[in-house]
Amino acid sequence: MTVGIVGLGLIGGSFAKAYHAAGATVLAYNRSRSVLDFAMMSGAVDGELTQDNVSACDLVLIALYPEATVDWFRRMAAHIGPHPVVVDCGGTKRTICAACFPIAQAHGVTFLGGHPMAGTQFSGFKNAKADLFHGAPMVIVPPDFDDVLLFDRVKQLLKPAGFARFSFTTAQAHDEMIAFTSQMAHVVSNAYIKSPTAAQHKGFSAGSYKDMTRVAWLSPEMWAELFLENKDNLLHELDIFMAHLGEYRDAMQRDDLPTLTRLLDEGR
């Protein structure tokens, strides 16, 4: 198998290491040449992915920010051809799929939206791990839901990464869910850590503090773009969250033990 990786950050780098460990030939593109050179020197990448060899890939994984994903695919679509399956790995799906599905159709390319549900609070190729996706879910957004053979092919192509299960959904449904399951956690954690009290936490914090703050350490550029790409869904979830916080605050302000107890019980 020959796999093309576009972007060698945490996600793309982990895919490169996973497929290399599985015996695949890995070709990669990265905006920073020094990262690509390091990846080749470390053995995770066998060569550079270019417009001349992209059509020879069985699978192409795009691990860039949403806007960069669309730009790369628009620029390369004419060179990809009918053989490779192209899957993007961005954190939101509506903007990417709305732009890339028509481009793919115009050039006879097989393109699917994707979102590997795995990661860490760290970024960059230096933190990439071959087992990052082991046991993780993979969300796939196809252009239509009639091609069962394509679904099976995608599963087989992604099997070396170690995903435990696959979910096939629409871009709209994906973005609605991801606002709650991922983006909310990041924005709430990031806001929580801004309390002046956080500077004095040592000696007074344990597991709950660690759990609450882990994802506050994020890439500001990437997450800002993802939040704005999905702002309608994220703002909806934030409004619900802030309304519930207000209920807790009001109950405490009134010394209302029964109401506070009920609220805490409902949230378990």
Functional labels for PLM-detected ranges:
Residues 1-51, 55:
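NAD(P)+-binding Rossmann beta1-loop-alpha1 motif at the extreme N-terminus of oxidoreductases
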Residues 2, 25, 110, 137, ...:
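Residues at the starts of beta-strands that form the adenosine-phosphate
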Residues 31, 64, 89:
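Short beta->alpha hinge that forms the Motif I/post-I loop of the SAM-binding pocket
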Residues 60-61, 87:
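N-terminal Rossmann-like NAD(P) cofactor-binding module of classical short-chain dehydrogenase/reductase
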Residues 74-126:
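Rossmann-like NAD(P)(H) cofactor-binding subdomain of soluble oxidoreductases
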Residues 130-217:
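Internal alpha-helical scaffold of NAD(P)-dependent oxidoreductase catalytic cores
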Residues 200-268:
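Interdomain hinge/lid region at the active-site interface
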